Amino acid sequence: MATGSNLTAVATALGEGERWWFVGTLAIIRVPGAAVDGRFDLTELLFPHHASPPLHTHPVDETFVVLEGHLTVVAAGHRFVLQPGGIGAFPAGVAHTFRVDSDTARALVLSTPSGLERLYREAGVPATAPTLPPPDTPRPSADEMRRIFDATGQVNLGPPLGADD
């Protein structure tokens, strides 16, 4: 990480930024790491009902701030519910997953240092609208996802949460 050579100020409105359809969700990169010298990136995510990633870890710290909807979260052996205004913080290497229990959920996700935005770009496709992706939106194959996870330091440890978990 450089020291102050690529710093700028960034201001975006809700829903404004670089948009990606990422594995059934909408990811809007609101503050790219390049704008803040890689210190962090900030992404707005829109999730559909019952969205749940596999239990996983990241090589960066991840903090969720729920704006809309309800999430059931399992992290470091604990289970909790996040509602609007709720925050979940997952240090690098801490296993976590979640499930969207509302019709949709929207959250701001902070990656410290920058890193998660690369995952959205590599596994996503450019979004043509600020909505959830259409059902026929291409998704990476299981082999492609493994390659992307390896390249970005993400580690899958277990299954996603089911509707009844």
Predicted regions and their residues:
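Short strand-coil-strand connectors
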Residues: V23, V74-A76, D101
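Glycine- and acidic-residue-biased ligand/ion/polar-headgroup-sensing regions
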Residues: H49, V60-L71, A76-G77
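Ligand-binding loop in jelly-roll beta-barrel domains
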Residues: V36, T72, A92-E117
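Conserved strand-loop elements at the edges of beta-sheets that form or border functional pockets
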Residues: F47, T57, V65, P84, ...
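Short acidic-glycine-tyrosine-enriched beta hairpin
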Residues: A11, A35, H70, G77-A95
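Conserved short histidine dyad/triad with adjacent acidic residue
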Residues: I29, D41-T57
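A short, N-terminal "cap"/entry segment at the start of jelly-roll beta-barrel domains
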Residues: M1-R39, L132-D165
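A contiguous, mid-protein "functional segment" used to position or interact
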Residues: D103-D150
